[in-house]
Amino acid sequence: MQAATVVINRRALRHNLQRLRELAPASKMVAVVKANAYGHGLLETARTLPDADAFGVARLEEALRLRAGGITKPVLLLEGFFDARDLPTISAQHFHTAVHNEEQLAALEEASLDEPVTVWMKLDTGMHRLGVRPEQAEAFYHRLTQCKNVRQPVNIVSHFARADEPKCGATEKQLAIFNTFCEGKPGQRSIAASGGILLWPQSHFDWVRPGIILYGVSPLEDRSTGADFGCQPVMSLTSSLIAVREHKAGEPVGYGGTWVSERDTRLGVVAMGYGDGYPRAAPSGTPVLVNGREVPIVGRVAMDMICVDLGPQAQDKAGDPVILWGEGLPVERIAEMTKVSAYELITRLTSRVAMKYVD
């Protein structure tokens, strides 16, 4: 009997990379594998994508794990380096790094390195989180071009704040700032992540950085799914029924008795709970698949168990398979029901959930 297990479909992952190449045919791909590849497994994901042009991570530790695991492709530190003492390692491992503040620039100017570092200057075009402000950008860029520790030419990167809102006007403003600054500069350019790839073809430039869409999940909050863009879900969160019980009309279920059956029925108990990372906020009615059939969660999600209403005529039995999201049940639907973003759902699964990779 299988308890909580994430099944990762390598074939779907490779399909998605190819699909994104079709959407951005003139651009190279930075496959973003930060946060344990969005919960899909850092090394296994990178090894499944030998055709990716580079990989993107948020921490130096993630980059070092890739190198230790045999990944030789370029690795981009999307947030840059946090300590000047990391620069020799970045240089020796040939990592690319974002540079977005004065402290990082000064560290590069003062460092003693055997080889120069490939730099992506981060321009704040409107996200207002990381990056050099436009009015300071030319001077900052000039210093990078004069720095002996920076491999030339300097590349330029930015990030959209509202790419998933095509009618708000913010993305056009960011693109205008980005284009103005990049004009006449020889380096590579990148601004499009998942939303930009899907909705803003004029933003694709030299490199795109697919994140959540690489894993078959839509970055948009408009009830779309990855399938709407030709992508396939890579992760399926699965488990099993550990009990099937007769349940009488009028009886409550679970902590607090928040759900009361209106009929005699059969209840299934699933080996899954918030201790595995499934959202405790999932209300009664949230769908799961039992033997490929959609049934509703009833009562509160507990630490280790979820109850589902199988229906009065159900023939399901203990040990039968359950899918909480994934193939046949998009995680975007669970996000909509629980008001927990799909990004959070797939990245917060706990260490007791087993990982299984299939082709």
Swiss-Prot record:
Keyword Mitochondrion appears in the UniProt entry: no
Reaction catalyzed: L-alanine = D-alanine
Record PTM N6-(pyridoxal phosphate)lysine, positions in chain: K34
Any one Gene Ontology cellular component term annotated for this protein: cytosol
Keyword Secreted set for record: no
Keywords: Cell shape, Cell wall biogenesis/degradation, Isomerase, Peptidoglycan synthesis, Pyridoxal phosphate
Effect of E165K: Reduces catalytic activity. Slightly reduces affinity for D-Ala and L-Ala
Pathway: Amino-acid biosynthesis; D-alanine biosynthesis; D-alanine from L-alanine: step 1/1; Cell wall biogenesis; peptidoglycan biosynthesis
Uppermost EC category: isomerase
Similarity comment: Belongs to the alanine racemase family.
Function in brief: Catalyzes the interconversion of L-alanine and D-alanine. Provides the D-alanine required for cell wall biosynthesis.
Subunit structure: Homodimer.
The name this protein goes by in its record: Alanine racemase, biosynthetic
Taxonomy of the source species: Bacteria, Pseudomonadati, Pseudomonadota, Gammaproteobacteria, Enterobacterales
